[in-house]
Design a protein with these regions (language model features):
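Beta-alpha-beta core module
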Residues: 157-166, 171, 236-285
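Hydrophobic hinge/microswitch elements
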Residues: 130-131, 139-142, 149, 208-209, ...
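Central regulatory/effector-binding core of bacterial HTH transcription factors
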Residues: 92-155
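Secondary-structure junction motif
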Residues: 182-186, 190-191, 196-221, 306
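A short LG(V/I)-centered, amphipathic sequence patch enriched
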Residues: 42-61
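Short helix-boundary/capping micro-motifs
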Residues: 12-30
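Acidic, Gly/Pro-rich loop/turn segments at junctions of secondary structure
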Residues: 129-198
Length: 309
């Protein structure tokens, strides 16, 4: 008997629900057909994966083992198309990047220009998206590299062992607001501690900056009298709304540095509310083509010289 990879999805559905009927509905098939597929998987393995005597159906010891192995197998299979492309394009000079929107506009262009003096670069393909989507592109080997904000205390969506990274720059999340006629912030964070409601502009769940901010400052923000007047996944959108005077937003200093210098935005809280950030370049640990490996080596050299000039 040959194993059908879709049986893993059947197993996962039943393991999650413990109910054959509900799992069959999730897999869009009749219960008898679903039960036959689970039985076929067990026959292929030579062991029972579920204790059918219990209600709901309970995963057996072998089933718990298979749950872990199956997850690893699915991750491995999902990565195969990207790895196949990597082998096929080993001699290609094209570099494929995924970068968050904020860094695509601010950090990436001058950083690439500086690296061009150290490495010969061919064409570059850039995908600009929210960090969650960028992580997915790297995990699926759709890109060679991902550039994103990071913080040492906040886990990214990528496993450190499988996705090594370099700190290639720094930034800072700064709470900012449009100024009033006297040059003072229209929306002050400390105002939320005195009973006044502070209007906030927030990041959505897909945002890497939002992930960092919620992890490090979320509890303190929740203690304030506040109201979110707008939520978005792009820092550039929050910047536009902040410039319009709608509320206070934590924005990357690389994005709003010119606004702060020209007085279009002002810092709206004390230094304790600011968050120092790393800018990290991520890659998959498996070997890429010569062009990508050459670029990684140049980035490593540049980073080492930046820390030890």
């Amino acid at each position: 008997m040959t194993m059908n990879l879709s049986w893993i999805d059947d197993f996962n559905a039943l393991a999650a629900t413990g109910n054959f009927s509900r799992a069959a509905d999730e897999r869009h098939m009749t219960q008898p057909a679903f039960s036959r597929r689970i039985r076929a998987l067990e026959e292929w393995l030579g062991a029972e994966l579920f204790d059918r005597r219990s209600q709901p159906a309970r995963v057996t010891e072998v089933g718990e083992w298979f749950r872990v192995v199956a997850q690893e197998l699915q991750v491995r299979v999902a990565a195969m198309p990207g790895e196949a492309r990597a082998v096929a394009e080993a001699s290609s000079t094209t570099l494929r990047f995924a970068a968050t929107h904020a860094l695509s506009f601010t950090f990436l262009p001058p950083w690439l220009r500086a690296l061009e003096t150290r490495a010969s670069m061919g064409p570059i393909q850039l995908v600009s998206d929210v960090q969650q989507k960028c992580e997915g592109l790297l995990a699926q080997s759709e890109v060679h590299f991902m550039l994103a904000h990071a913080h040492t205390s906040v886990r990214s969506g990528l496993d450190d062992a499988s996705y090594p990274s370099l700190v290639v720059g720094s930034d800072q999340l700064v709470p900012v607001s449009a100024p009033d006629d006297d040059g003072l912030p229209l929306h002050r964070l400390e105002g939320g501690t005195t009973g006044a409601i502070v209007h906030l502009l927030g990041y959505s769940q897909e945002s890497g900056l939002g992930r960092i901010l919620r992890s490090l400052k979320g509890p303190a923000i929740e203690r304030l009298h506040h109201q979110y007047v707008l939520t978005a996944h792009l820092a550039s959108v929050l910047r536009t709304v902040a410039l319009d005077g709608r509320g206070l937003a934590w924005l990357p200093k690389l994005l709003v540095g010119d606004d702060l210098e020209r007085g279009r935005l002002v810092v709206a809280a004390s230094a304790e509310w600011q968050v120092d950030l790393d800018i990290r370049l991520y890659r998959h640990r498996s070997r890429a083509g010569d062009a990508a490996e050459g670029f990684w080596a140049a980035a490593q050299t540049s980073t080492a010289q930046r820390h030890h000039p």
